[in-house]
């Protein structure tokens, strides 16, 4: 899927003096890196623009400072461009109530997910060939010849590094590595990123042990169900349990899944695969994503067996 262009996104940013940048709920390295990295890019290259980031990093990546301004006057919104990074539907966007006011002059979506949206966008840079939204933004900076300050470089590197699973995913490309090298040259603090992300706590170790002792299999599908009872026992939050890649690339298993029970009793599904299109399955259950990495929400535990069966059938008939 391709919608809009790099040039369209760059020109939209140039056009507005007031900008508000949004990230998605359950934030990760890519949405936060894209939001905060773009914030610093704009501040460094357009001294007169007022830029605000809304949301919350939920204490993720605490080794680097992130800026959020969640109280914004309506007078500001009426003159502003809203930029939504790494997301498409309002129910997936933190502080969506600001978008629901319908006060923004225009909306720009920058995203690498091949999904439609309900944002009523005026401008788009949607292209699924990128491994990360941060990769898109680094290319924007390169095309526009923007200065990349070290703090922006570090934030954008976080997004590329995490969303490519440390450059291991199949859609990691020459372009990905080239743009990451540009961030190296811009003095991204690579060491602090790698040290932080490769750090393992005792709680992490106990969680991994539990997963490896309690995973289940069906056909060529391997999966783990993380109930609220398990989360309480291991003293983990639902978000902390979103670790589907603990089951990645195990011989003879083409699809791996995590089912994570949420506080409201819904169950978050993380779907990953090696060469099998799991996006279709995610869409069936109201979700979406990429062919090899998608997600969805189901409403009860009885649906878990349905999802697993769909994955088994997908492999058989692939």
From Swiss-Prot:
Q: Any keyword Transcription regulation?
A: no
Q: Which cofactor does it need?
A: a divalent metal cation
Cite the GO molecular-function annotations of the record. 3'(2'),5'-bisphosphate nucleotidase activity; exonuclease activity; nucleic acid binding
Per the record, what are the reactions this protein catalyses? adenosine 3',5'-bisphosphate + H2O = AMP + phosphate
Q: What SUPFAM superfamilies does UniProt report for this protein, alphabetically?
A: DHH phosphoesterases
Loss of this gene results in the following:
Probably essential, it was not disrupted in a global transposon mutagenesis study.
**Pfam families assigned to the protein according to its UniProt record, in alphabetical order:** DHH, DHHA1
> What InterPro entries does the database record attribute to this sequence?
DDH_dom, DHH_sf, DHHA1_dom, Oligoribo/pAp-PDE_c-di-AMP_PDE
EC top class, as a word: hydrolase
Would you say which domain of life the source belongs to? Bacteria
For the keyword Nuclease, the answer is yes
| The EC number(s) this enzyme carries | 3.1.-.-, 3.1.3.7
Keyword terms = Exonuclease, Hydrolase, Nuclease
Annotated function: Bifunctional enzyme which has both oligoribonuclease and pAp-phosphatase activities. Degrades RNA and DNA oligonucleotides with a length of 5 nucleotides and shorter, with a preference for longer oligomers. Converts 3'(2')-phosphoadenosine 5'-phosphate (PAP) to AMP.
Q: Which family does it belong to?
A: Belongs to the NrnA oligoribonuclease family.
Name this polypeptide is given: Bifunctional oligoribonuclease and PAP phosphatase NrnA
- The species this protein belongs to is Mycoplasma genitalium (strain ATCC 33530 / DSM 19775 / NCTC 10195 / G37)
> What gene name is given for the protein in this entry?
nrnA
